[in-house]
């Protein structure tokens, strides 16, 4: 399939709640909706798979009570199958697990899908895309980490772009969402969109912006340069 024949799904903006002020989460959720974003990206870290701890199931439950936005829950945890059921029960709309974090990836995917929730698989910067090739028919999204996971505000690792191009070709007629997480900014959004990535996770770029609504539009459509 040539690049001309590939139809990339519509662009979705997923502000990362990790970049918000944790003492003002309800306000942050309201702001995200006001900016025009469709999703909220929720990074759950356990201090084992990644060197940081963020929040757990209770926070997702509280987000669900306060917002009707799509909750994109990214489990940066070892053996995510231990926690999936509770995150779903508490209101997650999508669960993304790391290919590197679970021994039986297909079984873990089915654990999510069998509960009627969307499922994604994430791969770290050094993990090749063939780690997800065999499960593309069972998932809704591939998340490409464009920084080493564990902390917000890190610089963008550009070879996520080539991974996206190769993934689009690998997907053929079944074009899934491809999400990018890490170092997204107005400076690199054009090349990100050009690579076929269509779900944009942005933390500092939005929460530290002077005009978040305007910045979100740039992240959605590019700079026009």
Go through each PLM region and give its residues:
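Conserved N-terminal beta1-alpha1 strand-loop-helix module at the mouth
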Residues: 2-96, 100-104, 111, 117-119, ...
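Generic enzyme active-site microenvironment
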Residues: 41, 179-180
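A short, flexible beta-alpha/helix-coil linker loop
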Residues: 46-47, 147-151
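Short beta->alpha connector loops at strand-helix junctions that form conserved
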Residues: 98-99, 145-146, 203-204
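Short gly/ser/thr-rich secondary-structure transition/capping motifs
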Residues: 122-126
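Acidic, divalent-metal-coordinating active-site segment for phosphoryl/phosphodiester hydrolysis
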Residues: 183-195
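Acidic, Mg2+-coordinating phosphoryl-transfer loop and its flanking beta/alpha structural elements
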Residues: 197-202, 207-208
């Amino acid at each position: 399939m040539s690049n001309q024949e590939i139809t990339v799904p519509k662009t979705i903006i997923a502000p990362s709640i990790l970049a918000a002020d944790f003492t003002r989460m309800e306000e942050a959720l309201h702001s995200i909706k006001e900016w025009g974003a469709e999703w909220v990206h929720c990074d759950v870290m356990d201090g084992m798979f990644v060197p940081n701890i963020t929040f757990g199931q209770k926070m997702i439950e509280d987000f669900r009570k306060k917002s009707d936005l799509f909750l994109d829950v990214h489990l940066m945890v070892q053996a995510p199958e231990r926690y999936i059921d509770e995150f779903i029960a508490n209101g997650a709309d999508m669960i993304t697990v790391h290919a590197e974090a679970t021994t039986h990836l297909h079984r873990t995917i089915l654990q999510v899908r069998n509960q009627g929730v969307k499922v994604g698989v994430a791969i770290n910067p050094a993990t090749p895309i063939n780690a997800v090739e065999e499960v593309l028919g069972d998932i809704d999204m591939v998340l490409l980490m464009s920084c080493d996971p564990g902390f917000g505000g890190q610089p963008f690792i550009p070879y996520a772009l080539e991974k996206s191009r190769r993934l689009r070709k690998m997907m053929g007629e079944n074009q899934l969402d491809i999400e990018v997480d890490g170092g997204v900014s107005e400076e690199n959004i054009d090349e990100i969109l050009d690579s076929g990535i269509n779900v944009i996770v942005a933390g500092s770029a939005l929460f530290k912006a002077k005009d978040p609504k305007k910045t979100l539009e740039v992240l959605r459509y590019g700079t026009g340069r």
